[in-house]
Amino acid sequence: MEKNTAPFVVDTAPTTPPDKLVAPSIEEVNSNPNELRALRGQGRYFGVSDDDKDAIKEAAPKCNNCSQRGHLKKDCPHIICSYCGATDDHYSRHCPKAIQCSKCDEVGHYRSQCPHKWKKVQCTLCKSKKHSKERCPSIWRAYILVDDNEKAKPKVLPFHTIYCYNCGGKGHFGDDCKEKRSSRVPNEDGSAFTGSNLSVELKQEYYRHMNRNSDENEDYQFSESIYDEDPLPRPSHKRHSQNDHSHSGRNKRRASNFHPPPYQKSNVIQPTIRGETLSLNNNISKNSRYQNTKVNVSSISENMYGSRYNPSTYVDNNSISNSSNYRNYNSYQPYRSGTLGKRR
């Protein structure tokens, strides 16, 4: 009888043939990475030597653009269209299938190149004639529902909140700008920033405002050719001497176009001596005016005694009597040096 070997299990696996290489053990592994690569070789996971013809070698890198091996995507020499898959024909942004006409909804051309010139398109949402309902930009703008009561209210277009993306001006959209377009991309199909996307009521108000502003700007336009000509010669003015009083300020005021001041009018009373005025009777002659005036000469001379306007500090009775020769107002007449004229 055979002995029962349970619970022991007999290993029936075949032994490793001596002609195959075995992966290095932990004792054979060195800390030097170069020796480890040389020890493992090409088939380091399966213990295959580099000289073995039947060994499974690693594949070359695969390109993510054309799916070919031997190069990476950054070095790929082929042009692959991501829309139609054409190779070495055109770029993705130039693919005919990616270009869709906003007028006939066909692919391969823009609105300006549409062969259906007679076809009319109108959006049922914003009443625009430049795109269909499926391409309306107001679809992703409708965040709040509007009641019927709010629709009945008259709409007012806030021009102070409308700015142009082309010139930065206020009061119009970028597609309707009259200035030269700053972007090199042609605006053939239009965008959402145009007056055509407004409702019927606001559209009329918008274009009426645009026409009014264009008329006002035309009034301020001028030709710059007038500045190219030589300036006109200026008239030469002769120099006048200091004693020539023909061009004094008084004569200039008389020759001006303004109205004369009130004291130059004939019907206004003109004073002759400080502190006294004439009567309202204009028939009195000038000689009678000066004869009828009464001036206390002695009082004037007494008041001038000791003041800076007195010609001398010495008081003489004869000088007081002859004080009528002095003017009854400021008699100060300095010399060239600016000092007072004192008699010694």
From Swiss-Prot:
It is found in: Nucleus. Its main location: nucleus. One of its GO terms (cellular component) is nucleolus. Residues 317-337 have a biased composition (Low complexity). GO terms for molecular function: molecular adaptor activity; protein-macromolecule adaptor activity; RNA binding; zinc ion binding. GO terms for biological process: nuclear mRNA surveillance of mRNA 3'-end processing; nuclear polyadenylation-dependent CUT catabolic process; nuclear polyadenylation-dependent rRNA catabolic process; nuclear polyadenylation-dependent snoRNA catabolic process; nuclear polyadenylation-dependent snRNA catabolic process; polyadenylation-dependent RNA catabolic process; RNA fragment catabolic process; TRAMP-dependent tRNA surveillance pathway. InterPro entries: Air1/2_Saccharomycetales (IPR016713), AIR2-like_ZnK4 (IPR049024), TRAMP_AT-DNA-binding (IPR051644), Znf_CCHC (IPR001878), Znf_CCHC_sf (IPR036875). The keyword Lyase does not apply. Keywords: Metal-binding, Nucleus, Phosphoprotein, Repeat, Zinc, Zinc-finger. PROSITE patterns: ZF_CCHC (PS50158). It comes from the Eukaryota. SMART domains: ZnF_C2HC. The modification Phosphoserine is found at S31, S49. Present with 1800 molecules/cell in log phase SD medium. Belongs to the AIR1 family. Component of the TRAMP complex (also called TRF4 complex) composed of at least HUL4, MTR4, PAP2/TRF4 and either AIR1 or AIR2. Interacts with HMT1 and NPL3. The interaction with NPL3 requires the presence of HMT1. Interacts directly with PAP2. This is Protein AIR2. The gene is AIR2.
